[in-house]
């Protein structure tokens, strides 16, 4: 086993009273004011001189001048931590500029300097607390902010903070205007164990009808395993919310709607967008967790995934990218696999659906998601693509595979028992 130190985040929902809500808004507004003022100064310096100020001490030096009221409210430690957060953002901007000059970014990836904590002309409250400035009482479920001597009840169970050897880091408290709730996000440094044994290799192809197609190398029995995760529920969710959002858009475009009705409709509009996003993210999380568990069961140690680069630019629209958001799915898979000690590698997936994984010849697309090889065998198109990705990663292509199908939903992953006349691979 190899021990690797990583940073993870625990999210807690804060249970506030009107008094606590006023306190959080006051402190959060002051922190947002600091971030906006400092980013305005640095952005102006960047656009006028081309120089990038990424030092946290330049903001710290102004604590007794223009930032004194914020400094007095936040305290020395938390003010310094907010300055470090601003510095981290500008260091990231500098790194992206260097990557763009070296040609490491795609042409459509535009690099912009850090912006402002504002929405609809109002500051978005945010509270930043240093690692030693708070304490989490897991028994009483209280978040204690030391400088202000305030206890805030919370709900939820931290996943990473309770692990042995976990080290708490920066705390960020934010307000969700759609849900009208406060959330505390704890940065936690933990040590994960990564397996170094020679497990099986596997390939992953991401798609539309089949959200994930996963194929392993042949096991000791000489047979591989293919796992297919359907994208039907995800697509159904998208079209359901799209229809609901379109109805509200029609009502908003009606000039007869009164101002009060419009404010309510806009609130519903934002809630539907947020709910659709949450459903999608939860489907991704459930599918990734289930697949990681299957990898451990099948003794898979390394996984190769086909990277979908440029899809949103080459084939934009809801049919390809709007609902599936492949990059987020890929990042979710990478994080979940890392948590389970499984290595994930990205390789190009160009042409993997057009070539037979066994013979290397061009295949003919048939109805119902099948491809036909000139040598006579028929294979599921997504299984064939996953095999090609596995092959590109240096894995062995199985001659026969056992196919298992699953339906990932926002609540769980459902196994599908299908009776097939023959092996689709």
Language-model features: where?
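Substrate-contacting helices/loops that form the catalytic groove of nucleic-acid
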Residues: 47-56, 60, 177-181, 185-202, ...
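Short polybasic amphipathic segments
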Residues: 134, 140-146, 211-218, 369-372
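Positively charged, low-complexity nucleic-acid-binding target-recognition regions
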Residues: 2-7, 191-192, 318, 324-425
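Gly/serine-rich nucleotide phosphate-binding loop at the start of the catalytic core
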Residues: 1-81
């Amino acid at each position: 086993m190899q021990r690797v130190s990583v940073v993870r985040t625990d999210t807690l929902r804060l249970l506030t009273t009107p008094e606590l809500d006023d306190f959080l808004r006051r402190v959060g507004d002051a922190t947002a004011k600091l971030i906006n003022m400092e980013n305005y100064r640095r952005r102006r310096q960047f656009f006028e001189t081309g120089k990038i100020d990424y030092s946290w001490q330049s903001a710290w030096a102004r604590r007794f001048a223009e930032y004194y009221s914020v400094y007095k409210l936040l305290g020395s430690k938390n003010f310094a931590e907010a300055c470090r957060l601003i510095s981290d953002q500008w260091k990231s901007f500098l790194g992206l500029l260097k990557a763009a000059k070296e040609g490491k970014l795609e042409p459509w990836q535009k690099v912009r300097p850090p912006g402002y904590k504002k929405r609809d002309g109002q500051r978005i409250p945010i509270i930043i607390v240093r690692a030693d400035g708070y304490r989490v009482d897991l028994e009483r479920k209280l978040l204690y902010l030391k400088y202000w001597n305030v206890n805030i009840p919370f709900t939820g169970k931290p996943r990473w903070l309770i692990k042995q050897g976990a080290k708490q880091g920066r705390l960020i408290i934010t307000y969700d205007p759609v849900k009208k709730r406060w959330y505390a996000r704890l940065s936690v440094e933990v040590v994960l164990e990564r397996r170094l044994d020679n497990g099986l290799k596997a390939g992953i192809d991401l798609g539309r009808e089949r959200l994930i197609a996963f194929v392993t190398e042949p096991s000791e029995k000489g047979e591989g395993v293919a796992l297919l995760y359907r994208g039907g529920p995800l697509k159904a969710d998208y079209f359901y919310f799209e229809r609901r959002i379109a109805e509200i858009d029609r009502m908003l475009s009606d000039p007869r709607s009164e101002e009060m009705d419009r404010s309510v409709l806009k609130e519903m509009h934002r809630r539907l967008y947020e709910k659709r996003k949450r459903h999608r993210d939860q489907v991704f999380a459930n599918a990734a967790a289930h697949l990681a568990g299957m990898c451990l069961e099948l003794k898979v140690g390394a996984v190769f995934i086909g990277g979908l680069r440029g899809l949103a630019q080459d084939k934009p629209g809801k049919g390809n990218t709007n609902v599936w958001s492949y990059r987020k799915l890929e990042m979710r898979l990478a994080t979940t696999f890392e948590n389970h000690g499984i290595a994930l590698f990205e390789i190009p997936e160009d042409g993997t659906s057009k070539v037979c994984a066994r013979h290397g010849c061009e295949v003919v697309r048939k109805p119902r998601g099948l491809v036909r090889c000139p040598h006579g065998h028929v294979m599921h198109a997504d299984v064939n693509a996953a095999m090609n990705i596995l092959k590109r990663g240096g894995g062995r292509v199985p001659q026969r595979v056992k196919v298992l199908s699953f339906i990932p939903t926002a609540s769980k992953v459902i196994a599908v028992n299908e009776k097939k006349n023959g092996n689709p691979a």
